[in-house]
């Protein structure tokens, strides 16, 4: 359901006869921002630190996203009888990292406490940015303010890797072009040992897409931390 209200409660929303009305929609909505709304520079952010609640759970992804609809330009007396259709898309993309232990791994289970995705090419997260919703093709343009080339995914509880099934980890990432080897993935185990791999294939991360990468890890793949410390 979409409800139209005036940004100022003391004002009314009305249609100007014969005038084209421009309708923009996005989420999350901030009343404090909407009062001074400028569709050419809507504030947006994508945290460089994200928290997943548990194994295979994408429940956290929604709070990091920014949804937008293709703008509608209508003339009330001729177009309103057909209503206004708003189709929402995601401004960012989802990276689904799937991990499993190799059959010959010396351990049947390895608990992991966090992971990091880093790019040598472009930003993966925005501390501050703005979005222009008024582009001719209706595809928003992001102007970064301050950005980060890495995303750290933490877990509400330790997640256990096993030999039987892939375990899914989800990150919300910013669009960008990454050539072969630009992206590096680190997986940190409970003993602080680190599995690190450069993602061989290049990827052009586009909005509203899901990217899946599978990795099989052996015990020897983890480099011990110095000094050894259990978290």
Predicted features, each with a name:
Residues 1-109, 162-166, 191-193, 198-199, ...:
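Short, low-hydrophobicity acidic/polar segments
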Residues 22-25, 115, 182-183:
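Contiguous beta-strand segments of beta-sheet-rich domains
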Residues 46, 54, 120, 147-149, ...:
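Compositionally biased regions
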Residues 96, 117, 154-196, 200:
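Extended serine/threonine-enriched, polar tracts that run as long, contiguous segments within proteins
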Residues 81, 95-165:
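Short helix-loop boundary/capping segments
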Residues 114-138, 199, 203-210, 215-231:
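Extracellular/surface-associated beta-sandwich interaction domains
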């Amino acid at each position: 359901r979409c409800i139209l209200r005036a940004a100022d409660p003391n004002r009314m929303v009305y249609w100007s006869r014969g005038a084209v009305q421009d309708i923009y929609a996005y989420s999350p909505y901030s009343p404090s921002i909407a009062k001074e709304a400028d569709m050419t520079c809507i504030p947006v952010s994508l945290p460089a630190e994200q928290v997943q609640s548990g194994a295979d759970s994408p429940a956290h992804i929604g709070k990091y996203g920014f949804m937008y609809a293709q703008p509608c330009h209508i003339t009330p007396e001729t177009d309103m009888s057909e209503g206004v259709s708003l189709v929402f898309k995601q401004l960012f993309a989802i990276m689904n990292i799937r991990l499993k232990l190799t059959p010959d791994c010396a351990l049947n289970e390895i608990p992991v406490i966090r992971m990091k995705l880093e790019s040598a090419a472009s930003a993966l997260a925005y501390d501050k940015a703005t979005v222009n919703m008024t582009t001719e093709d209706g595809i928003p343009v992001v102007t970064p303010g301050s950005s980060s080339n890495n995303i750290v995914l933490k877990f509400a509880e330790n997640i256990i890797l096993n030999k039987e099934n892939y375990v899914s980890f989800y990150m919300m990432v910013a669009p960008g072009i990454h050539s072969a080897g630009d992206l590096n993935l680190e997986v940190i185990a409970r003993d602080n040992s680190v599995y690190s791999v450069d993602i061989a294939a290049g990827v052009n991360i586009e909005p509203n897409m899901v990217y899946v990468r599978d990795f099989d890890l052996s015990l020897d793949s983890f480099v011990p931390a110095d000094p050894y410390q259990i978290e």
